[in-house]
Design a protein with these regions (language model features):
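Generic recognition of stable, solvent-exposed alpha-helical segments in well-folded globular domains
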Residues: 11, 60, 64, 133, ...
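Active-site catalytic microenvironments for nucleophilic, acid-base chemistry
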Residues: 71-75, 244-249
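A non-catalytic, helix-rich entry segment at domain boundaries
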Residues: 68-187
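Nuclease catalytic cores
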Residues: 16-32, 41-77, 92, 96, ...
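Non-catalytic protein-protein interaction segments used by genome-maintenance enzymes to assemble
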Residues: 37-41, 176-241, 246
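Metal-dependent nuclease catalytic regions and adjoining charged, substrate-binding loops involved
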Residues: 217, 231-234, 246-309
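Conserved aromatic-histidine-acidic binding/catalytic patches
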Residues: 53-61, 126, 130, 199, ...
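Short amphipathic alpha-helical segments and their helix-coil junctions
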Residues: 5-8, 33-52, 218-223, 293-301
Length: 309
């Protein structure tokens, strides 16, 4: 293992959510799993790593939807035509393939390269209808998206207008290539791995912007896709972090930043403005939570922690 490969501390909104919800889960998620991919580690560490790589059916649904939307937008921005029906069939086919892979249990010996579901790992009795409803949620979400103002707006955009398009298609070679074999740059999404974070008082802050584009007047729209079943207000901190990123990395003035959240499952849209006050509040929240997170470290310099209890 490379000496440079270290578990360095960084901040993200999802990390904060885990920290606030359960300290034990936080430890497993960000510390207990480390080195679990190595051969000469205790079985407990390997098992923590294995569990970290698994998805539950709800996060799986969200990942599928995000990937599919990214591919739809990528295709549209490159003027590639996709058959609506064939695309949905291909997405369902991918879900079935991943489901079968999980059912095989291959993730138990190689969790890094094999998809796995927690429901299968724990041998939960999930009704067939539940899985079918999950599939229906995905299809409905894609239909809602293609009927949304965001899809219509993208039809008037060029690739140059797109500032960020998040969606990891690299692990999905077969499905995406089969859908559109002529999409020559299908894996080159405009989001750059080099700028998916910014530094705040020396702390790395990770950001994952689903979609962002710039208007002719220089204003920027940053959009977060949601796929949950519950309706409600979006996470204001998440959206404000997008705004913070835009000011720091793209040098966009606060007054030109427009934040949007769209729940494709519920066809529900929310919009927020960004401001200097909002940026300052976000800054203070991040730094305060960083301080709280580091209080549980046994070695702050090495970013090491021990399991409580």
């Amino acid at each position: 293992m490379s000496q440079d490969f270290k578990n360095n501390f960084s901040w993200s909104n999802s990390r904060l959510s885990t920290f606030k919800s359960c300290k034990r889960k936080y430890y497993f998620q960000y510390y207990g799993f480390w080195d679990g991919w190595e051969d000469d580690v205790p079985e407990r560490v390997r098992n923590i790593y294995r569990l970290k790589k698994l998805n539950n059916r709800h996060t799986w649904k969200g990942t599928i939807i995000h990937e599919a939307i990214a591919f739809l937008l990528k295709s549209l921005l490159e003027d590639k035509t996709l058959d609506k029906g064939e695309f949905k069939k291909a997405v369902v086919r991918k879900m079935r393939d991943q489901y079968k892979t999980s059912l095989s249990g291959d993730y138990k010996t190689n969790p890094k390269d094999n998809f796995g579901l927690l429901e299968h790992y724990y041998e939960e009795e999930v009704e067939k209808e539940t899985w079918q409803l999950l599939r229906d949620d995905v299809i409905r979400s894609l239909d809602n998206f293609r009927g949304s103002q965001f899809w219509k707006k993208t039809q008037s955009l060029s690739m140059e207008d797109c500032l960020s398009l998040e969606g990891d298609l690299k692990g999905s070679d077969n499905i995406w290539k089969n859908i559109s074999p002529n999409l020559n740059t299908w894996r080159n999404l405009p989001s750059s791995p080099a700028v998916d974070s910014f530094s705040l008082d020396g702390e790395k802050v990770w950001v994952k912007i689903d979609f962002a584009y710039q208007e002719e007047d220089g204003s920027v729209r940053l959009i977060d896709w949601k796929s949950g079943n519950s309706e409600g207000e979006p996470d204001s901190t998440q959206l404000n972090i997008y705004g913070y990123y835009a000011t720091e990395v793209w040098d966009i003035p606060e007054e030109k930043i427009h934040l949007k959240a769209y729940n494709v499952n519920q066809d529900e849209r929310h919009e927020r403005t960004f401001s200097k006050e909002g940026k300052q509040e976000t800054r203070e929240k991040i730094l305060k939570s960083v301080e709280s997170m580091k209080e549980m470290l046994t070695d702050k310099k090495a970013n090491e922690a021990e399991e409580e209890g």
